[in-house]
Amino acid sequence: MKKLKSFGGKNLSGKSMNQLQKLQEEMQKKLQEVEEGFSNVEVEVSVGGGAIKILATADRKVKDIEIDEDLLSDGETLKDLLTAGINELMEKIEKIREEEMAKVTQNLLPFGF
């Protein structure tokens, strides 16, 4: 059987290739589980001193938006606060997603990869 060169100049035998394939399949399964779990993770932001609250899940679905009635008469401020709130929410969600995905990959990758 022909050996393939891998990272660091090491040879990969058929057995090693099978192990890598199993590792890849396990990682894909774990990542899918984490992805599905994001629908159960709620993220909330509050902007404008609590005038606007936005609730979403880590799978990027907005569940609720609360707006102080006093803001409804000031369209420009409402727009600015909604924009700021949504941007802050998306940043929080991305941070959560990156951290959870990193946990999976760190736990599954063998030392040296």
Curated annotation (Swiss-Prot):
It is found in: Cytoplasm, Nucleoid. One of its GO terms (cellular component) is bacterial nucleoid. One of its GO terms (molecular function) is DNA binding. Transmembrane segments: none annotated. It holds the Pfam family YbaB_DNA_bd. Homodimer. HAMAP family: DNA_YbaB_EbfC (MF_00274). This is Nucleoid-associated protein THA_1374. It comes from Thermosipho africanus (strain TCF52B).
